[in-house]
Structures are given as C-alpha cells and as structure tokens.
UniProtKB/Swiss-Prot annotation:
Induction comment: Expressed in the late phase of the viral replicative cycle.
Keyword Transferase attributed: no
Keyword check for ATP-binding: no
GO cellular component assignments: virus tail, baseplate
UniProt record similarity statement: Belongs to the tevenvirinae baseplate structural protein gp8 family.
Disulfide-linked positions: 142-153
Summary of the function given for this chain in its UniProt record: Intermediate baseplate protein. Involved in the tail assembly.
Listed name of the protein: Baseplate wedge protein gp8
Subunit comment: Homodimer. Interacts with gp7. Part of the baseplate macromolecular complex which consists of gp5, gp5.4, gp27 (central spike complex); gp6, gp25, gp53 (inner baseplate); gp7, gp8 (intermediate baseplate); gp9, gp10, gp11, gp12 (peripheral); gp48 and gp54 (proximal region of the tail tube).
Organism name: Enterobacteria phage T4
Length: 334
C-alpha cells in the first residue's frame, strides 16, 4: 500500500467573484429576458415598547417560509431598483487621511485615492485619481513572524508591512510602463480618474465607484482611461483589475408615492427586503402572469409571495415626513 500523498495548493481567482457580480448586473433590466429588482419597506408596528432606547436590537430575520410571510404581511410599499442605481464599489482609502490608521503606510496591491483633499492634491482641475501600490520599501516586517526578507515573505504568501512611510502622494498618469516612482521606495500604478460629479453623488466616505465596462467604453476620457495600456482592443474590464466584487443597490422611498407612510403621527417602518421578479396582482387566478415593471407598487398591487426574496432586514424605526425622500443603500458582496 502506498502511503505517500501529493501536496498541492489551488485558489479560485478574484475574477470568478467579479464575473458573478458582472453577470448579476447585466441580468437586471426591463423585458422578458431580464430580471427586475424591488426594494420593499414595511412594518409600522413597534418591535417593543423600548425600541427607541440606546442599544436596542431588533430580532434577526429568519430565512424561512414564516420569515418571508412576515415580510409580505407587514409590507407598506415597493420601489424598483433601476440599473443606473447599481454601482460596483471598492473600499475607499485616501492618501494621508489622518482620520484612519496608518495614512502614510501601504502594502502591495493597496488601492489609494489622491487629489481628494488639500493634503493629497496633485493635479488641479482633475477629479479623484486612483492608484494601486505595486511595490513597497524593503525595510519592514512580515505577517509570517519567522521571515525577515521581503521577497521571501511574499513568495510564501505573507503580507509585507513596510516600516518606511510614503513621503509624497503618487502623481500623474504613469510613464510608458504605467508606473510611478516618487523616490521613497513606493511604486505606484495609475488606474483611473473619478469625475467630480461621480465623487459627489456616487462615492461615500467608505466606498468609491468603479465604472462598469459599458460605462467606461462609452466615455473613456471622462474616467481618465483614454491612455490605458493594454494588449487587446476594447479592454474596458477595469472592475477585474481592481478586483471589485461588491455591488451597491440604491433606491429612494419618496413620500409622494407612499403618502400613507408619511402622514403626521406615522410610526415609521422597520423592515427592508429585496425581491426579484415579483408579479402584478391578478384580477382572476387564471389570468396570465404579468411581471412587475413599474417604478413603484403598493403591496396590494403585487401578487403575494411572487418572485424571490433574496435579502431581509429588521432594523430600528425610520420615521418619514411628508416632504421626505429616504435613500436606501444595500451592499452585496459576491
């Protein structure tokens, strides 16, 4: 009997997760071959008499028939998520932002934003400039405690944290090889530019937007991508280069469409869910199925339990006013 074994190591690459995200995005839209997504809100009844106290936590939603039934029973309205309200996002980290730890120390493959504040301004009149760290100084420490050499650390799968700080923010769009070397031991790669209107309307303190391939193809100059170096034509897969795998859903709950939920003295709402491909309510059971494609629906205008509920959330109350529009953002990581 042969007791020897073969040791191998394998991974599923980041492109698998990015591809799943892109396929999901491309499946959303109007028409028989596309999926529709709706964000629902509901439950005006308080969780308990002390739900407004500090530290109160609502019950966990349950992924069961009873849990889905509870969401439908307490539903107050639904809002369609348009494809334009879906963004690929990655975590935001600004060079030199002292609100966060180690604002001048970076690791290989860190993605960093510049030109977003006076302390990292490099190009007047441009939007936010996004870079990737390609190399760091040799002095530092490895996540594998027994290793002290940077190259050996990286070859064995460790993470190298340099002890030297980045002295100046990366600047420019790169040389013929696309790299930027400020002279402090750090080497950077220019990725893309976030236009001013996008940084204001679609980016947050936590996340920056990465353009979808068709958005980038439509106007490369807008995203600072007109001089992108690539081995193939029409290569606009920036989401693969930055390993994006998180998609943000955005919807607006407008009191104009749901006035009953915003009347004076209303008790707010406490549940949110996401439903794919719900059907409109039928006048007769034998009527043909009609996929819901309007922008807004009241619960009675949808067929109860139709579609698939892919997200459930119980939360503290949100109280709406008559002139209020509530913005809801939900992140899915693939």
């Amino acid at each position: 009997m042969n007791d020897s074994s073969v040791i191998y190591r394998a991974i599923v690459t980041s492109k698998f997760r990015t591809e799943k995200m892109l396929n999901f995005y491309n499946s959303i839209g109007s028409g028989p071959d596309k999926n529709t997504i709706f964000i629902t809100f509901g439950r005006s009844e308080p969780w308990s008499s002390n739900e407004n106290e500090v530290g109160f936590a609502p019950p966990y939603p349950t992924d069961s028939v009873l849990g889905v039934t509870d969401m439908w029973t307490h539903m107050m309205g639904t809002v369609k998520v348009l494809p334009s309200m879906l963004d690929a996002v990655i975590p935001r980290r600004d060079w030199g932002d002292t609100r966060y730890p180690d604002p001048y120390t970076f690791r290989i493959n860190d993605i960093v934003v510049c030109n977003s504040a006076p302390y990292n301004a490099t190009e007047s009149g441009a939007g936010w400039l996004v870079y990737r760290c390609l190399d760091v100084p040799d002095t530092g420490m490895c996540s594998i405690a027994s290793l002290t050499d940077k190259d050996e650390c990286l070859k064995l799968g460790g993470k190298w944290t340099p002890s030297a700080r980045s002295m100046t923010p990366p600047e420019g769009r790169g040389d013929a090889e696309g790299t930027i070397e400020p002279g402090d031991g750090y080497v950077w790669e220019y990725l893309f530019e976030i236009p001013p209107d996008v940084s204001i309307n679609r980016c947050t303190n936590e996340y920056i937007v990465v353009p979808w391939p068709e958005e980038l193809k439509e106007d490369p100059t807008r995203w600072g991508y007109e001089d992108n170096l690539t081995w193939q034509q029409d290569d606009f897969g920036l989401i693969y280069r930055v390993k994006a795998n998180t998609i943000r859903f955005k919807a607006y709950l407008d009191s104009v469409y749901f006035p009953e939920a915003a009347l004076p003295g209303n008790k707010g709402f406490r549940q949110i869910s996401i439903i794919t491909n719900p059907l409109e309510a039928k006048a007769h059971p034998n009527d043909p199925n009609v996929k819901a494609e309007k922008d807004y629906y009241d619960p009675e205008d949808l067929m109860r339990h139709s579609g698939e509920m892919i997200y459930m959330e119980n939360r503290p109350p949100i109280i709406m006013a008559m002139d209020q529009t509530e913005e809801i953002n939900i992140l899915f990581t693939f």
